Amino acid sequence: QGKEKGTVDSEEPVILVAEDLAPSETVQLDKSKVLSFVTHKGSTNSHTAILARTMNIPALIGVELPENLEGKMAIVDGYEGKLILDADEETLCYYEKKKEEEEEEKKLLLNLKGKETETTKGKKIHLYANIGGMADLASVLANDAAGIGLFRSEFLYLESDKLPTEEEQFKVYKAVAETMAGKKVIIRTLDIGADKKVDYLNLEAEENPAMGYRAIRICLDQPELFKTQLRAIYRASYYGNIGIMFPMIISLEEIKKIKEIVAEVKAELKDHGILYGDVELGIMIETPAAVMISDKLAEEVEFFSIGTNDLTQYTLAMDRQNPKLESFYDPHHEAILRMIEMTVENGHKHQCWVGICGELGADLSLTETFIHMGIDELSVTPSMVLKVRDTIRKI
């Protein structure tokens, strides 16, 4: 790897091999240089793995690495979790054919661009895309997503070596809103902590960071940091259709505090004659606590977005970063599906729409189940949008 984050010392495109890659490093990889990456540490449920899927980079994470890999010809099979070295002619032909079949499937799916995302009985679903930044927008548009259901704003912080200013954030949010041309853009406020670390914030190392000082807890503890981001988002809302969602909510008190800070930000902007749009406020449902009081939370916000990755981790008491637990980490667990159903029911009782923005939203084996539960929106990796649309149109 090069001296700068995300750079690769090679003229030719390569398969990048590393002991580990942090989300902040992954998001800066140059896709023209990195065909794929393989790491020894990590888990397929980590944010690094999720980013690889968002960026459409084949990856193997948490695998044994043979020695002396540099310069070798290799095949990365992300579907089967295989690293194949010095493949014979038969294996090469097999993967060439597989690649051609995949390209053919992509071409067929392109016929669904411009079509409604609705079931055979006419039930419409809002099908949005998850992004980490501006670089993902081309894929969102190419795959005809109806909007952005999750803009992971933390990558503005992870990609920088200092705190992004209000102006820097405003320019990015405004550009995304304008590019989406009136389509919904839901920005998740700063969600760092756990495996997403920002050195310049000087956060203390924790024994159990997934349950520690992270996400909304940081924002409410450091209101000026929070207000800077909120000001930037509200200013950008004048130029498009923006919603805001807040991560890691566990109580009504948090929402009330958030609303107080939002009111202060809006008052400040008004006092300075700065225009802003009508912004929908929602929360992530990613803790069992939020699920259990979702009837009360629904009275306070306009939408829920279910983060199935963390909801699975916290419900099953299972570290999503630990590769030894991958076979036990089961988002299909009946407890998870019951929690999703409960959240939908409680949301709808109070006219609160409900979506899923976790990886489970793109699980085609559950699409019909989610529709029967009454899910209003699915937000998925851009490359999965047309596949999910195809599945929904056959239900």
Protein language model features and the residues they cover:
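Conserved alpha/beta-domain cores
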Residues: 106-395
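Glycine/charge-rich, flexible interdomain linkers and switch-proximal surface loops
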Residues: 6-28, 274-284, 291, 364
